[in-house]
């Protein structure tokens, strides 16, 4: 695959998921959009690593670290969303103002 095709795919994925993150009203959907943004970035890391220096795996290794951090972020995010749902009975972002009780 050519470099331009993968970069266009990654930019397409990043831009539409960023739009989904901005317009999302549900916390779970926003968390999923954030994870997909990280996947678009990982696609760029692997593509540039393969295109410019295919003998070294720096982009792939960095991508694995980003995936591990994203997994931890998803676990913590889902725990926070679960706690907010138990207390507020809603996962809507505009109804989860924790400063006023």
UniProtKB/Swiss-Prot annotation:
Q: Which domain of life is it from?
A: Eukaryota
Record Pfam families: Oxidored_q2 (PF00420)
Q: Where are the transmembrane segments?
A: 2-22, 32-52, 61-81
A GO term, aspect molecular function: oxidoreductase activity, acting on NAD(P)H, quinone or similar compound as acceptor
Q: Which reaction does it catalyse?
A: a plastoquinone + NADH + (n+1) H(+)(in) = a plastoquinol + NAD(+) + n H(+)(out); a plastoquinone + NADPH + (n+1) H(+)(in) = a plastoquinol + NADP(+) + n H(+)(out)
Note the topology in the membrane: Multi-pass membrane protein
Q: What is its main location?
A: plastid
What family is reported? Belongs to the complex I subunit 4L family.
How would you summarize the oligomeric state and partners of this protein? Answer: NDH is composed of at least 16 different subunits, 5 of which are encoded in the nucleus.
**Protein name, please?**
NAD(P)H-quinone oxidoreductase subunit 4L, chloroplastic
Quick one: which gene encodes this? ndhE
């Amino acid at each position: 695959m050519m470099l331009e095709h993968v970069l266009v795919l990654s930019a397409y994925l990043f831009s539409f998921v960023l739009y989904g993150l901005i317009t999302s009203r549900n916390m779970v959907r926003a968390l999923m959009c954030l994870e997909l943004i990280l996947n678009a970035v990982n696609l760029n890391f692997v593509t540039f690593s393969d295109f410019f220096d295919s003998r070294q795996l720096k982009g792939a290794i960095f991508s694995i670290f980003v995936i591990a951090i994203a997994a931890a972020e998803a676990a913590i995010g889902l725990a926070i969303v679960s706690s907010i749902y138990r207390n507020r009975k809603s996962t809507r972002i505009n109804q989860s103002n924790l400063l006023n009780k």
